[in-house]
Amino acid sequence: MSRKSIVQIRRSEVKRKRSSTASSTSEGKTLHKNTHTSSKRQRTLTEFNIPTSSNLPVRSSSYSFSRFSCSTSNKNTEPVIINDDDHNSICLEDTAKVEITIDTDEEELVSLHDNEVSAIENRTEDRIVTELEEQVNVKVSTEVIQCPICLENLSHLELYERETHCDTCIGSDPSNMGTPKKNIRSFISNPSSPAKTKRDIATSKKPTRVKLVLPSFKIIKFNNGHEIVVDGFNYKASETISQYFLSHFHSDHYIGLKKSWNNPDENPIKKTLYCSKITAILVNLKFKIPMDEIQILPMNKRFWITDTISVVTLDANHCPGAIIMLFQEFLANSYDKPIRQILHTGDFRSNAKMIETIQKWLAETANETIDQVYLDTTYMTMGYNFPSQHSVCETVADFTLRLIKHGKNKTFGDSQRNLFHFQRKKTLTTHRYRVLFLVGTYTIGKEKLAIKICEFLKTKLFVMPNSVKFSMMLTVLQNNENQNDMWDESLLTSNLHESSVHLVPIRVLKSQETIEAYLKSLKELETDYVKDIEDVVGFIPTGWSHNFGLKYQKKNDDDENEMSGNTEYCLELMKNDRDNDDENGFEISSILRQYKKYNKFQVFNVPYSEHSSFNDLVKFGCKLKCSEVIPTVNLNNLWKVRYMTNWFQCWENVRKTRAAK
């Protein structure tokens, strides 16, 4: 009988194994073993030729999404929060109707027929690898939906799976962001050769990663031929560029920076790092780079990097120490009017005050046109709109004050008592704080929300002592140069009884178990501290708040009609523009409806973002005169680049229309 695949076996060919028979006698029941012998026996699955995953053909599917019209006013629209917790799942009340059309390839379902089995068996791994490589190299005709944090392709995932992925990204170690996972291989020894010992594997050298050449959008060029690099440390060192600028201290921007970054064996010329004071101290703290290799740029002042080129650094409204840089080139011995102006935003959250400050510096040199703008295009997709930072901070702080004043039951309309109520001692509390507020944060960033809560509650900010975060926060508070945020080191404390607001890593708020683990760590600092707490409330600043249904855009082949519609959108947005940037305010009701009655700890997602929303970018591009806009994010998708370029052209049309009036 020839060997067959399991899909070729007929039911009639499967024989059951005979079971033991029992015979009974008049004297009692006696079990007798079956003496029947047969040449046939039951087969196990391992005896059949079952196709494995490596033999199966690889299929793909394409997704297309309907485009939705967007209203320029989001005043009456509640922000929908896509969990970043780690960018847990919450009940969303959304009434918008979303139409999603999924076009599945006919070859998506794999059907195995008798005449195909042999063909599948003959396919080798080399052939499959070749097919995969071909598929990777083929340009995808559908839009690639990426995670804004690690830029991984999420197109093949369902919506809830995309949310879960972003939860993992936000809660993971920032140093791992944007780096591919290592392939895990099983090493099987060859029977003809002895297996490698552990010592041999340990002593084997890892291959050296070949650094890529600096991409063009990382290099800024001036008329006199001078060149500088911005946020480009993970590439092959240039033989002619010695000035490197770091916009802020986030891992996706300083990646590649290390203590030996100026090693003469690797670098043809000695380099200098330019950054803000806070960023310089953090770089020195983390990488031990000598301060004599770092040039601190003063805030809101002109600094000359050559005899004819200057840079003005302004607050980027991102994380502490983040800056936007206005480079201006002048003719020798003529500094009245610059011949070239370049603006690099780094990562930034645009607002009306920032735009006015840039326009003021441009007006001082009698040249209001920027030749090139290197723009942070993280949320450069229609629909990525969220409230201003000021609105979110004020609303969340007001909510905490209301919760302290009225209590959880009255605030949420819940008569059920918290478990902490029964655990708490009946004696007077050892400190005056009944509710513990946990605010999620990155290595650096999101501190504004926690500090605003401290101001409302008149309490200090607690950070775990002897931690890297404590050292960083102390550095930020001691060297704060932002005139809008009057912070000082007296705000920070490591005494549990001086604070009811704790700054914690976002991963602490991922689940009830991780919060329990954090409270356990507090018990190690002081045994009786947790017993006096009645409630624990956490806030996850997500930034992923937008009108549902506008997240994904359908590709439109009619560029002319699309351009016309986009221009109208920009004109309408500018017509209804307000100076206070709070037309899309955040309301307490958005927090209250996330309440989970049966959860021991309440965790709320709030749409606090340190990146510019889509509408922020539109206002920025329509108000500033610029000849060319160069995106710095979402450049790995050709359609996305064209999509952004169309919007840049619309901004130019709007500027011309407004100037003609």
From Swiss-Prot:
Task: Provide the binding site for Zn(2+).
Answer: C147, C150, H165, C169
- For the region Disordered, what residue ranges are annotated? 1-44
Q: Does the keyword Transcription regulation apply?
A: no
Supply the InterPro entries for this chain.
Answer: DRMBL, Rad18_UBZ4, RibonucZ/Hydroxyglut_hydro
- State the top-level EC class: hydrolase
| Annotated Pfam families | DRMBL
Q: Which regions are flagged for Basic residues bias?
A: 31-43
* Inducing factors: Expression is increased by ultraviolet light and agents which induce DNA cross-links such as nitrogen mustard and psoralen.
* Transmembrane spans: none
Q: Which SUPFAM superfamilies match?
A: Metallo-hydrolase/oxidoreductase
The record describes the protein's role as: Required for DNA interstrand cross-link repair. This requires cleavage of cross-linked DNA to generate DNA double strand breaks (DSBs). This protein has 5' exonuclease activity on single-stranded and double-stranded DNA, which appears to be necessary for the processing of DNA double strand breaks prior to ligation.
Against PANTHER family, the record matches this protein to: DNA CROSS-LINK REPAIR 1A PROTEIN, DNA CROSS-LINK REPAIR PROTEIN PSO2/SNM1-RELATED
Similarity remark: Belongs to the DNA repair metallo-beta-lactamase (DRMBL) family.
Q: What is the protein name stated in its UniProt record?
A: DNA cross-link repair protein PSO2/SNM1
Give the gene name: PSO2
